[in-house]
Design a protein with these regions (language model features):
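Short beta-strand/loop motif that positions the catalytic acidic residue
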Residues: 131, 136-143
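C-terminal catalytic histidine-bearing segment of alpha/beta-hydrolase fold enzymes
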Residues: 145, 149-197
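Short beta-to-alpha linker loops that shape the active-site pocket of alpha/beta-hydrolase fold enzymes
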Residues: 12, 17-21, 80, 174
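Mobile cap/lid helix-loop segments that gate and shape the active-site cleft of serine hydrolases
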Residues: 85-127
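Primarily recognizes the serine-hydrolase "nucleophile elbow" in alpha/beta-hydrolase
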Residues: 41, 46-98
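Alpha/beta-hydrolase active-site loop
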Residues: 22-43
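The serine-hydrolase catalytic nucleophile loop
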Residues: 1-2, 18, 149
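Short amphipathic alpha-helix adjacent to the substrate-entry channel of hydrolases
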Residues: 1-13
């Protein structure tokens, strides 16, 4: 719904598949090339509004932290913010054993190294707060796949402590799906407002 509403307002919606790279440095490099192509070859704005759903939370945050000057805002929808939570399943969530192995491989980490890793979206938010990148999350309070307490709540607490701006819409009784909102106006307004700053 959000994408369609933005298209109706004249925005471009673009996608670069890196889901199976889990926001790893390889994914960031691929997005760097994609960004350069869009800006240089097609004249796109130099600041992008980033949108990530579920595992997309990993790349939107990790790319933004590597490129804060290129980001107008971040919209995360049921975002994975710590790979130990999903796909790792090291907290309250179920995780996904096969996907966890693929995640470790994408990062070149052992399981022990992954437990000490400090390059998840929940880490190093200072660079985004310093750049005044506004954040917006939509979460289902009953999400058992990507538990809110291990993901979005951690970002919210840490970002506010850093003086960053974050808005969160909580959907009571809703799990990981459906994504977005029946009426995407709050999300669209956030993106439009942030792009004018």
């Amino acid at each position: 719904q959000t994408d369609l509403a933005l298209l109706e307002k004249g925005w471009h919606v673009v996608y670069c598949e890196v889901g199976n790279l889990f926001g790893s440095p390889k994914a960031v490099v691929r997005w760097d090339a994609f960004y350069a192509y869009l800006v240089k070859e097609h004249g796109f704005a130099k600041k992008a509004a980033l949108e990530g759903m579920s595992r997309g939370g990993l790349i939107i945050y990790n790319w933004a932290k590597a490129n804060p000057e290129k980001v107008s805002c971040i919209y995360g929808d049921a975002p994975v913010c710590d790979f130990k939570s999903w796909p790792g399943g090291k907290g309250k969530g179920k995780g996904s054993a096969g996907t966890w192995k693929n995640c470790l491989k994408a990062y070149g980490l052992t399981e022990k190294e992954a437990m000490d890793f400090k390059g998840n979206p929940i880490d190093g938010l200072e660079v985004l707060a310093k750049a005044k990148v506004p954040l917006f999350h939509v979460i289902g309070e009953a999400d058992t796949v990507v538990p809110v307490a291990e993901n979005s709540d951690v970002i919210e607490k840490r970002y506010e402590e850093l003086g960053g701006s974050i808005e969160v819409i909580r959907k009571p009784g809703i799990g990981h799906h459906p994504h977005s909102l029946k009426d995407p106006k709050p999300i669209v307004d956030f993106v439009l407002r942030s792009s004018k700053q």
